[in-house]
């Protein structure tokens, strides 16, 4: 009787642990890539799920990058926030310096820059301001010195 109770308790514990673990979460080293599609090393089915690398969180849908990816510096500060859709950059793309200041901010659509583009000096002032339309610079671009003073304006053709 006691052996049966111990077995039932052990089995219940094992089942509860497996119910709360996420089988879709893996490490990047567990993936392989074939023609821009990601697979688990032992699978022929394109991978869908979350990949964890330290604090970084990367998401895949049908073997392609998908969703908001956030990566971190070793000090815990955010390194980048980028958005993917169907394996292409799509949405906000923000890069930060190790100290937490924004370095670059732009928007992508279907893998091409499409919208505003801001490059910042390390003191937080603008270094470059401009815009893209489907990967091509458009409109007025402004360039600034390290103190944030406007030094040049160029019209993109």
What are these regions (language model features)?
Residues 1-8:
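Bacterial N-terminal signal peptides that target proteins for export
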Residues 17-157:
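Glycine/tyrosine- and acidic-biased, solvent-exposed loop/turn segments at the edges of beta-strands
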Residues 8-18:
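Bacterial N-terminal signal peptides
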């Amino acid at each position: 009787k006691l052996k049966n109770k111990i077995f039932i308790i052990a089995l219940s514990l094992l089942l509860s642990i497996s119910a709360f673990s996420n089988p879709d979460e893996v490490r990047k080293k567990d993936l392989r890539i074939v023609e821009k599609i990601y697979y688990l090393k032992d699978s022929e089915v394109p991978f869908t799920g979350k990949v964890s690398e330290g604090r970084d969180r990367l998401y895949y849908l049908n073997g392609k990058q998908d969703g908001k990816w956030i990566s971190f510096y070793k000090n815990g500060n955010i390194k980048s926030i980028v958005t993917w859709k169907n394996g292409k950059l799509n949405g906000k793309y923000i890069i930060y310096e190790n100290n937490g200041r924004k370095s670059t901010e732009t928007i992508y659509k279907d893998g091409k820059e499409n919208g505003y583009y801001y490059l910042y000096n390390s003191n937080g002032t603008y270094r470059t301001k401009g815009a893209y339309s489907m990967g091509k610079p458009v409109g007025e671009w402004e360039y600034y010195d390290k103190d944030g003073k406007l030094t040049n304006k160029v019209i993109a053709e």
